[in-house]
Design a protein with these regions (language model features):
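Residue(s) in the substrate-gating loop at a strand-loop-helix junction
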Residues: 6
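Short C-terminal tail/terminal secondary-structure segment
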Residues: 11, 102-103, 114-127
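Conserved SDR Rossmann-fold cofactor-binding beta-strand/turn motif
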Residues: 43-53, 106, 119-121
Length: 127
């Protein structure tokens, strides 16, 4: 079982307390399910992406959280602010990066991995 959370499930961010609280809850659920289901050989992990290039992030309301001094921020202006949050020189990750992490955790290669939050975050949790 793979639950999708967010980097905000492992780190606090200003102005989105409701989102941070919900994503931290996913971590608690994942750990509880890992303990409950482990004896049945069911693995449970969570994935914690940074910004992903989807409409959830690529919209004016969200971009203004990251570029508050620009009334109508462009994708390029948002990219600069977003990249500054990451250790790796990328502004966001692609949906396929999350899909690949899910495939790995669901595969036999991860057969002994359970109860683990896996960041797919371009280093945002390190900065």
């Amino acid at each position: 079982m793979v639950l999708i959370s967010s980097a905000a499930g492992l780190k606090a961010y200003a102005n989105i307390g409701h989102y941070v609280a919900a994503k931290h809850g996913v971590v608690g659920l994942m750990r509880t399910l890992a303990v409950e289901l482990g004896p049945h050989r069911i693995r449970v992990n969570s994935i914690h992406p940074t910004q992903v290039d989807t409409t959830m992030i690529m919209n004016e309301t969200t971009m203004r959280l990251f570029v508050p001094d620009v009334e109508h921020p462009t994708r390029e202006e948002f990219a600069v602010a977003s990249q500054a949050m990451h250790l790796l020189p990328v502004p966001w990750v692609e949906p396929r990066d999350i899909s690949n992490a899910v495939l790995f955790l669901a595969s036999d290669e991860a057969r002994y991995i359970t109860g683990v939050p896996l960041p797919v975050d371009a280093g945002v949790l390190t900065v």
